[in-house]
Amino acid sequence: METEANSNVGQKGRFYLTKNIWVPQEPIENLNLKMSDIILRRMPKLPLGGVDALKAFPVLAELKKSHDKIKADLQYLLKHHEEIPALHEVHPRDLYVAGRAWRTFLLKIWGHEIVENTAAVPDTYAAISRIPGVHTALFSILHGYAEIVPHRGSAAGVIRFHYPLIVPSEPEKCWIEIGGHHFFWREGEPLVFDDTREHWVKNQTDQTRVVLIIDFNADMPFPVNLYTALRYNLIRHSTEVKAVRDRAAIGVPPRKPATERADGLISGARHMTEVATTSRPGKSGH
């Protein structure tokens, strides 16, 4: 968890390269947004939803293949719902929703695995690990009647992937708007978009929406790839991101992967069969 040494890291308007060295956030964001004009011309056409998203990024089908296992991980995680922090409790500058109506369970942040969290959802993390280039992954849990105000990411060249796992029974009443494009989620139907485009979310139902979010860098030609690689390493090794990683780790008990749970059930069934066989009365000679 957060230590005294980095308790101030994440102050609004600052980006911490080390505990004591920070730079103003706004110039960095402005540079990224200016670069995004260059990068955007080299990005795939986004946003894309459903089949179109999987055609453009077939490797993301790994999540659909593991849908049931990921859903089982999520159901286990939601038993510990009250322990899952709000986004602003993990990243204080990101106050897009008041209170705890938007909770996030981070698995990976800019290349740092949060081992305490991935142990609770092993099959989910295994599926994510089969997708090359993923640097950030999390469960995004939005409560009923919550709204995420318009915002935009500052990391140009990052592709964001939403994989819906729990959606309200009236999906058209829980939606996201991305750069003027209106989408609503359906379970198992992915959505891919450019995080630097302004987007906002509204849940007009009394039901919870949960999506698995993963971020990865788009392939860029030389020399643009040098810029995105430099930015990635600066962010990854910053005290800012390390502080987020530490805050995000919570104490949800570990869960065995599905294969181990299945092996345990088989072993248990065999043991019960053996016990029943050995305890069965033999034929009497009298």
For each predicted feature, which ranges?
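Fe(II)/2-oxoglutarate oxygenase catalytic core
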Residues: 1-152, 209, 223-286
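Short, conserved beta-strand element in jelly-roll/cupin
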Residues: 141-144, 154-170
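Short beta-strand His + acidic residue motifs that chelate non-heme Fe in jelly-roll/DSBH
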Residues: 148-151, 193, 199-205
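A short hydrophobic beta-strand segment most commonly corresponding to one strand
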Residues: 160-164, 192, 207-223
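A short beta-strand-loop-beta hairpin characteristic of the jelly-roll/cupin
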Residues: 166-187
